[in-house]
Curated annotation (Swiss-Prot):
PANTHER family in UniProt: FERULOYL ESTERASE B-RELATED
Reactions listed under catalytic activity: feruloyl-polysaccharide + H2O = ferulate + polysaccharide
This protein's name: Probable feruloyl esterase B-1
Keywords: Calcium, Carbohydrate metabolism, Disulfide bond, Glycoprotein, Hydrolase, Metal-binding, Polysaccharide degradation, Secreted, Serine esterase, Signal, Xylan degradation
EC number: 3.1.1.73
Disulfide bridge map: C28-C75, C63-C114, C187-C441, C256-C273, C282-C291, C503-C525
An example Gene Ontology CC term for this record: extracellular region
Keyword field contains Calcium: yes
Cellular location(s): Secreted
EC class (word): hydrolase
Range of residues in the leader sequence: 1-19
Amino acid sequence: MPSLRRLLPFLAAGSAALASQDTFQGKCTGFADKINLPDVRVNFVNYVPGGTNLSLPDNPTSCGTTSQVVSEDVCRIAMAVATSNSSEITLEAWLPQNYTGRFLSTGNGGLSGCIQYYDLAYTSGLGFATVGANSGHNGTSGEPFYHHPEVLEDFVHRSVHTGVVVGKQLTKLFYEEGFKKSYYLGCSTGGRQGFKSVQKYPNDFDGVVAGAPAFNMINLMSWSAHFYSITGPVGSDTYLSPDLWNITHKEILRQCDGIDGAEDGIIEDPSLCSPVLEAIICKPGQNTTECLTGKQAHTVREIFSPLYGVNGTLLYPRMQPGSEVMASSIMYNGQPFQYSADWYRYVVYENPNWDATKFSVRDAAVALKQNPFNLQTWDADISSFRKAGGKVLTYHGLMDQLISSENSKLYYARVAETMNVPPEELDEFYRFFQISGMAHCSGGDGAYGIGNQLVTYNDANPENNVLMAMVQWVEKGIAPETIRGAKFTNGTGSAVEYTRKHCRYPRRNVYKGPGNYTDENAWQCV
């Protein structure tokens, strides 16, 4: 039996930890009385111990989250913040006990008014004082925008900025040391919101991680809407079943997988892939469940073509090959894309009965001319952000089934041209990484585990975690040359099958050997 003398250090450490926890809990429960900020109504302040599976009874059903596991002790502050006489955002701040002196804002997705609790849990668990808002409305529909321009303005830019202003004040009020640096982490609409901050509020963040950004958003809505006009409804002679999309995908891989030097089921650079479909067009008498008709082949060609406007101007680049299986159930399913239908019904035409099956590029012209509150988020002069010392890191999955990765390359080129700077100069403040085998923000067939979300987390090492890579860039001046991704054996949380270093654009990954394609050192950025 160990002596009491040997146990004393452990008992003392345990007592200190409990005392610290009690102090933090007491500080949290008394914090509500200290909050007196303009336009802020505190709904509640709760201490949440680490390990809690937090129930979320007030979260809108369409947001799809009823609970969230919280890994570290946090002080949870729920608020309503007025943004005008007729609008407000629902805002939460999660202030962790293991605070590292860093502030962070999360973003949103789609058209949704959903607080992303998984991002709050993820980043507060890493020691960030984190805020997240509902973008000014509740649920995933675009209907709240109908005849409510103030709500729309919250969605476009005001929600995140308001959350930042309030969140920074709360952070300084709660922690004596305040915060040393501020960060942003978001994907999809969250990626667009990150770039909106870069463009419109250059002093809000020191570092912005913006994934699969939905900028060029009005044209994105039109691009998503136009797929129905290509595929037609289920059963039409232009429609492809999921099985036919699988056949198409296999043929695309046969033609394009080996371009990067390795046949591993992953296309490292879809821009080099221009599928020729003649090999899978039906021969006379062949079973049409095993091949494509001429009209179906035309459908595929149209899907892999850019969208041009009524005057021939490029609106949106093509969908990248390699994403077709995942996109088939969402974008090519024989129904109008819901977000696009909502946008046109409730914002563009203010007509809930507008028929989304009748969409044409003439509608795209109407929508783009409106561009309410500059939703496009397509401004290419980000010199103010650069002058403020900010860093922006963007990534895009090359299997993205919702937002073409080609659009991120298009914006990168626009910034370089507008600011008249070459890639090596852009690298000083703006870096873009293409993530092969990553679908929309997460998932996919490749090494998508880059730590951009809780579900893609592998570890907190900056070499393996895109958020912590940004922290290292901002705080130590060490900019990431590659982003290492993990390929999981059986989805998120399973063992790591292999890792791959994803290249900084405009470089691309090429297999050189001599090791197997699962060896990250067998690949080179060229």
